[in-house]
Amino acid sequence: KNARQVFAIETGENGLLFFQDNTPAYIIRRFDIARDGTKIKQEDFASLLGKTSLTHGGSFKYTGSYEDIATCIKRYVAAWQAEMAKFFKLVVFNYLFCNSDAHLKNFSLQQTPDGDYRLSPAYDLLNASLHVKDSDFALEEGLSPNLVKSDVYSRTGHPCKEDFETFGKLIGLNEVQVQKALHSFTGSDEQVKQLISNSYLDERSKRMYLRTYEERVSRFNRKN
């Protein structure tokens, strides 16, 4: 809900329904099936990067960096800058909302009716800290092994806004694109809090969700 309603990130259409015994069920419309029932070609980035359990071990989907995904986008997407801006925004979102399970198989390219490729709608967006011990990033090499870290990152071990600015430019975005994406995350705290408050999470999970989000925002905005 936060991704789609607050930050205008394209996601699969989804909803929550309840059975007669009040057991909840999360449903999502498949976005790899066209309205006429035909299959839409889609590949995740583990496949596009040639990574499997045979080539990279059991944790293959957690290997590499987000720069690897960006490089792959440039390789397969003709209008890559527009899709790169979407990808960059999604990386920032995952960091702010503690989605430390944003691995290679949770990003995909999808073929359009014209035969070219675009990022698929975002999926598996969750606050992983509610379920497991959290880390900043799912991928072992983080944003990029080539990232020149800010003083804050070097000192604290956690990236801040300056590091995402550097990463955005590293993957080929210009200053305007980077700042537009980052600006979209400012001034939305009240909307986020309201959505968390109105969610079907239990009260303990709501408090934890809000606390972890506020901690990430604080890290993100840290300058010293």
Where do the model's predicted regions map?
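Anionic ligand-binding catalytic core segments
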Residues: 1-104, 108-224
